[in-house]
């Protein structure tokens, strides 16, 4: 596909690495960023360790237009994501009045005051601006550095999604490439992925703006089930949809020739 602005997702949390928590945030963000027109180039998971966070953020700076971290924004000792971001930027942490007001307001509504641990959530990398958390206590942060927009979001999925949609998405739309992205697909029954492969390859050659991927769900032999997803980019929604449908038609022809059937369809 044509080159688009790159995005990196850096997930922070020991609980992700030891398998205690499934990283649904990365999948959710990957989908949203792709539909905005960014090319998600890398998803990395690191422990709650300042040096590891700084290393990955530092690698992303200048290489990815958008760098999003998730997790590690809370009040506890192991919430160190913003320290890692600050280290990568070569900056210190600074108490941000706007972020502090967000934290104060959250706890005030619950009849609670500020403590040292709660104030910690308002310490942002120097030069960063807070992202309001519509659901929880910890603000996010966003900063431009070395050609990259670095945004830090909470790890709790409901908080992360709300902050992305309300606070970060408008910023991303300003730097997203022009055009439209369409994603759709079909579920193919009775055809092994290996038999379908030549048709998928043919579909992917419809246009450099089209990406076709097969996902086998059943066994290769016996009762094969293959989901085929098509992602198309174009200058308008209509053009993107037309490209996607053209690619899907190649796959449909293959299904028919191979004696299979389509059990589900996700329209473009």
From Swiss-Prot:
| Annotated Gene3D superfamilies | MoaB/Mog-like domain
SMART domains linked? MoCF_biosynth
The protein's matches in InterPro entries, at most eight in alphabetical order, are given as: CinA, CinA_Arc, MoaB/Mog-like_dom_sf, MoaB/Mog_dom
> PANTHER family, from UniProt?
NICOTINAMIDE-NUCLEOTIDE AMIDOHYDROLASE PNCC, NMN AMIDOHYDROLASE-LIKE PROTEIN YFAY
Q: Give the record's family classification.
A: Belongs to the CinA family.
Would you tell me the protein name for this molecule? Protein APE_1980.1
Please report the organism this UniProt entry assigns to the protein.
Aeropyrum pernix (strain ATCC 700893 / DSM 11879 / JCM 9820 / NBRC 100138 / K1)
């Amino acid at each position: 596909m044509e080159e688009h602005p790159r995005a990196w997702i850096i997930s922070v949390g020991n609980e992700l690495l030891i398998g205690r928590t499934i990283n649904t945030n990365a999948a959710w963000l990957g989908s949203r960023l792709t539909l905005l027109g960014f090319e998600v180039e890398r998803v990395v998971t690191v422990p709650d360790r300042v040096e590891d966070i700084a290393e990955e953020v530092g690698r992303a700076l200048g290489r990815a237009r958008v760098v999003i971290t998730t997790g590690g924004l809370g009040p506890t000792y192991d919430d160190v994501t913003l320290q890692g971001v600050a280290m990568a930027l070569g900056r210190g942490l600074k108490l941000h009045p706007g972020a502090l007001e967000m934290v104060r307001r959250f706890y005030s509504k619950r009849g609670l005051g500020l403590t040292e641990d709660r104030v910690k959530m308002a310490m942002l990398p120097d030069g960063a601006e807070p992202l309001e958390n519509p659901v929880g206590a910890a603000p996010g942060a966003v900063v431009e550095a070395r050609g990259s927009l670095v945004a830090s979001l909470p790890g709790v999925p409901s908080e992360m999604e709300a902050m992305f949609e309300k606070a970060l998405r408008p910023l991303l739309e300003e730097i997203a490439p022009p055009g439209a992205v369409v994603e759709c697909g079909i579920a193919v029954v009775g055809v092994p992925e290996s038999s379908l492969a030549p048709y998928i390859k043919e579909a992917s050659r419809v246009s450099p703006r089209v990406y076709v991927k097969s996902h086998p769900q059943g066994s290769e032999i016996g009762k094969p089930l293959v989901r085929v997803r098509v992602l198309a980019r174009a200058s308008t929604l209509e053009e993107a949809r037309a490209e996607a449908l053209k690619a899907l038609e190649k796959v449909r022809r293959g299904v028919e020739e191979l004696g299979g059937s389509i059990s589900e369809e996700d329209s473009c």
